[in-house]
Amino acid sequence: MEKTYNPQDIEQPLYEHWEKQGYFKPNGDESQESFCIMIPPPNVTGSLHMGHAFQQTIMDTMIRYQRMQGKNTLWQVGTDHAGIATQMVVERKIAAEEGKTRHDYGREAFIDKIWEWKAESGGTITRQMRRLGNSVDWERERFTMDEGLSNAVKEVFVRLYKEDLIYRGKRLVNWDPKLRTAISDLEVENRESKGSMWHIRYPLADGAKTADGKDYLVVATTRPETLLGDTGVAVNPEDPRYKDLIGKYVILPLVNRRIPIVGDEHADMEKGTGCVKITPAHDFNDYEVGKRHALPMINILTFDGDIRESAQVFDTKGNESDVYSSEIPAEFQKLERFAARKAVVAAVDALGLLEEIKPHDLTVPYGDRGGVVIEPMLTDQWYVRADVLAKPAVEAVENGDIQFVPKQYENMYFSWMRDIQDWCISRQLWWGHRIPAWYDEAGNVYVGRNEEEVRKENNLGADVALRQDEDVLDTWFSSALWTFSTLGWPENTDALRQFHPTSVMVSGFDIIFFWIARMIMMTMHFIKDENGKPQVPFHTVYMTGLIRDDEGQKMSKSKGNVIDPLDMVDGISLPELLEKRTGNMMQPQLADKIRKRTEKQFPNGIEPHGTDALRFTLAALASTGRDINWDMKRLEGYRNFCNKLWNASRFVLMNTEGQDCGFNGGEMTLSLADRWILAEFNQTIKAYREALDSFRFDIAAGILYEFTWNQFCDWYLELTKPVMNGGTEAELRGTRHTLVTVLEGLLRLAHPIIPFITETIWQRVKVLCGITADTIMLQPFPQYDASQVDEAALADTEWLKQAIVAVRNIRAEMNIAPGKPLELLLRGCSADAERRVNENRGFLQTLARLESITVLPADDKGPVSVTKIIDGAELLIPMAGLINKEDELARLAKEVAKIEGEISRIENKLANEGFVARAPEAVIAKEREKLEGYAEAKAKLIEQQAVIAAL
């Protein structure tokens, strides 16, 4: 084997070989259980980020683990067309490169442009997924807008429409005036901001007066520009100030519209003035009040967020109405919405109707992609009736057909599902699945799979002009069908029969509503088992946390703290990293701050660590919490682990290749160490499998690390040396056999998490075991064998380790060179301790570097020694001639003084109120941790001083 482990040389060629050989495909053995995971489809034109790397590592670990258990295993891969995100990227691209908008291209040509862009950049993410080692079946790769999936989408839309579960309605939606499309509640980001509350007088009509004799009501509002669309004023029916005015009217300032005063709980007696203006077409709460009191709806805004030249007036059901005039005063027409706000306030003030302006804290909704203030807008949209679909989806989780891991996420799911709103599925975009609905000139709507079907079903001749709905479906509509559409539905395919319901869905908790809930609803509605019972899309939902940076901040381009997973695999220089973090920024003014932070964090760029080290780190961080802080130190630690495994394997091969390892018969004697490592390894298999079976990848990674590093490399390989240097033929055969057996099993055990290094080493080790199979990927996963767990060997070896560690600690504490042979005395030995010494003198002398071992009677004082208590004996190392008492005490005093200096420096820092107030929580915690460490070190040194002073 190469002297040093170099992941760059082995990973990519190995992956290409695996893919070419078809190892990622299901084995097709229907006598075996099936295991299937659907990959959450990443955006087709996106690139791999830490969240992808994290979730895909977890999925690949599960897939490889189940495949090695002989299951018929499919990891279904595919990408998402990502409507709004992809359209924005291409719009920005043509604006930058050609100075054009999508309207210059027209719909058809612009969509062609997006397909071109997909062809050009659509391979990026799948190339990157290959770099991660993902063992997905690439031959089955799907795209949410490929022909098969597009047919499934149309099929679902048409069936739901025919069942009256999809309808078209005039409703209020979150409207993004910049992107000119409806967006979902989940894409709205609420930001706190300082604003004003304007108090405006609305004159009472017909000579009416308030309880205290005023001829007007004062209405408080944070959005005076919407006054132009008011159709009512609400007061609380219990409010003694106004309840007698319910049913009377006010005259709307500026517009002179006569609008009613209604009694509604929505008006809070304690808030503002107790009178609330009602604008059903421009506020979600007002829309509900309007429905309760049959108030008309007046839309005053264009889709760009400007004031219209004439208003649109609708009745409560959304039909056009002439109950009010559509006139808007000329001075406000065509004004941008925030300019209109100023103009309306000025006009009201000029009439003497502005009572006061108060500062007011408010929450303003912004679109998370367009970045502008969202406008509630009355539009025609398509909706899915969600309550009917939600009922079985709630029951599936209640009765355990679907389980959430960790379980607490069920509550989040229930709270949303039990209060579910109808789902607005239309988007005013060009890129996506176009809604399969057509209109004739009279405005009648026809829904069908294509125009031909529509004409045939509705007997529409060629003379009837039809135009297709311009809108496309919300991207999440097609994603909701992902588990079954990818397997060939609506056809009844073999794949659907074998792999559905799928086994596990791995997802971030942030899309539990966007995606998980909608998959459950859609799948259970459309997929039934042979008894007609609704099928769930998956049996288990494994929720991951979000990966944040080392300070717990969310990774984002604007914070400049994004780490590209492949930069950790391949390494990246500082200049390249800076360019990546500060190039093409939306907010270039942040570049300087980002540059400084990056230079501080990565003064030499990022070293290459290889894919296996990245995967091991991600698995080790996969705790059940919501947030996971990324830690470069852990990554370095797991790269060191890979080096350690490589070097240990070289040691094993150097001692076994070309030797008799006992695989072809011949007498074998197993040493205590051999019996011990086989017992340890079997206990490790048991615990590791339990961790993987319960989705505790962090615990599994810890078990693997601890066994490999501490037991196998640090202890067992050392314990084999006495046999290697002087054992009998049978002993040599036994130890070589054990070395090879444990290493080969360990490689299979570790393979799901670190596939590349394990396959590479295994190809060398398999020869020694007489294995002829081609790949570790399809080898059986190790199974626990209770007969290999020799309790006596475990107990005896733990005792030997305890004795060896005690001697090593005395060397370190007394500053004695590691190579200097020592005398060891054991006093007051129990029978077990004495037996262990006599049976294992060779081990003890070699590993603890001992000249001699002497057992003393319990009452023998012995020479001046440093003593440690171990199980069943006192361990003494005579100090004569080993240390100079005065020099050693002086050295320790110096060490203590140095540590005291550090302690007082940190104590002063933590006593400084300015520092504590300003420094981030993580920094303060680090300082406290350092302080604890120094205090412990000081206590140890003082203890040593006492020991030496007593010599």
From Swiss-Prot:
Disulfide bonds: none
Gene3D superfamilies: HUPs, Isoleucyl-tRNA Synthetase, Domain 1, Valyl-tRNA synthetase, C-terminal domain, Valyl/Leucyl/Isoleucyl-tRNA synthetase, editing domain
Compartment list: Cytoplasm
MF annotations from Gene Ontology: aminoacyl-tRNA deacylase activity; ATP binding; valine-tRNA ligase activity
Keyword entries, A-Z: Aminoacyl-tRNA synthetase, ATP-binding, Coiled coil, Cytoplasm, Ligase, Nucleotide-binding, Protein biosynthesis
EC nos: 6.1.1.9
Catalytic activity: tRNA(Val) + L-valine + ATP = L-valyl-tRNA(Val) + AMP + diphosphate
Xref: InterPro entries: aa-tRNA-synth_I_CS, aa-tRNA-synth_Ia, Anticodon_Ia_Val, M/V/L/I-tRNA-synth_anticd-bd, Rossmann-like_a/b/a_fold, tRNA-bd_arm, tRNAsynth_Ia_anticodon-bd, Val-tRNA_synth_C_sf
Main location: cytoplasm
Coiled coil segments of this chain: 880-944
Motif 'KMSKS' region: where in chain: 554-558
Binding-site positions, ATP: K557
Matches recorded under NCBIfam families: PRK05729.1 (NF004349), valS (TIGR00422)
Function (record text): Catalyzes the attachment of valine to tRNA(Val). As ValRS can inadvertently accommodate and process structurally similar amino acids such as threonine, to avoid such errors, it has a 'posttransfer' editing activity that hydrolyzes mischarged Thr-tRNA(Val) in a tRNA-dependent manner.
Protein name from the UniProt record: Valine--tRNA ligase
Natural source organism: Shigella sonnei (strain Ss046)
